[in-house]
Design a protein with these regions (language model features):
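The feature captures the beta-strand-to-loop junction immediately N-terminal to the Walker
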Residues: 44-46
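Helix-to-loop junction immediately C-terminal to a conserved catalytic motif
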Residues: 59
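Conserved ABC transporter NBD signature motif
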Residues: 67-74, 87
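Conserved ABC ATPase "signature" region
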Residues: 109, 121-140, 188-191
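Conserved ABC ATPase signature
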Residues: 144-148, 152
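Catalytic Walker B motif of ABC-type/P-loop ATPase nucleotide-binding domains
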Residues: 169-173
Length: 204
């Protein structure tokens, strides 16, 4: 499999005293933690424990009632998701969010070109093919995303993160509903991406 080269940047995430309420329900109460460097951490808890709420705050989908989140020295808890992604945080979702009417290859290079407007399309496409080779999906490059299995959809979402090159990757239930033959690829993805300098947060 191909080696996906990444910049080895110093990563620092600081979450401090986060609180989130929905009406009278206090979902997050004074949550604090930090990540330094290429750490691999797990966020484990039962349904309703607030894992998704925390993730939604980290990626800018919702705002906390109080508390702060800093990534690489920049405050991100008041930024919209696309700005958080530019700072360096990416995530997958329990329900995959591919562009179903685009091909697998287009699903990778279109978001990357949107983020890096000045990028050369040929260079980005070549990187997308390299990513698909790493995920053993190169043979599916011209298939429409809507034709993929649930496990292949998860791999495609992981590939999109590789293209966007975040410093911190949050994987929400990455093994849920995945065929055992694809689990090995996801394990390898986590190992290599973490080994090459990315911080990984696994949610289960």
């Amino acid at each position: 499999r191909s080696r996906i080269s990444m910049d080895n940047r110093m990563i620092e995430l600081e979450v401090k005293n986060l609180n989130k309420r929905f009406g009278g329900l206090h979902v997050l109460k004074d949550v604090s933690f930090g990540i330094k460097g290429a750490e691999l951490i797990g966020l484990i808890g039962p349904n309703g424990a607030g894992k998704t709420t925390l993730t939604n705050i980290l990626d800018g989908a919702i705002k906390p009632n109080s508390g702060t989140v800093y990534l690489n020295g920049q405050r991100i808890d008041q930024l919209p998701p696309f700005e958080v992604a530019k700072v360096g945080l990416g995530r997958t979702f329990q329900v995959t969010r591919s562009f179903r009417r685009m091909t697998v290859l287009e699903n990778l290079y279109v978001p990357a070109l949107a983020k890096h407007v000045a990028a050369d399309k040929t260079e980005v496409t070549n990187k997308a093919l390299e990513v698909l080779d790493f995920l053993t999906m190169k043979h599916l490059r011209n298939e429409y995303a809507q034709a993929l299995s649930g496990g292949q959809q998860k791999l495609l979402e992981l590939g999109r993160l590789l293209m966007l090159d975040p410093d911190i990757i949050i994987l929400d239930e990455p093994f849920a509903g995945v065929h055992p033959t694809l689990m090995e690829i996801i394990y390898e993805y986590i190992r290599k991406v973490n080994e090459e300098g990315k911080a990984i947060v696994l949610i289960s």
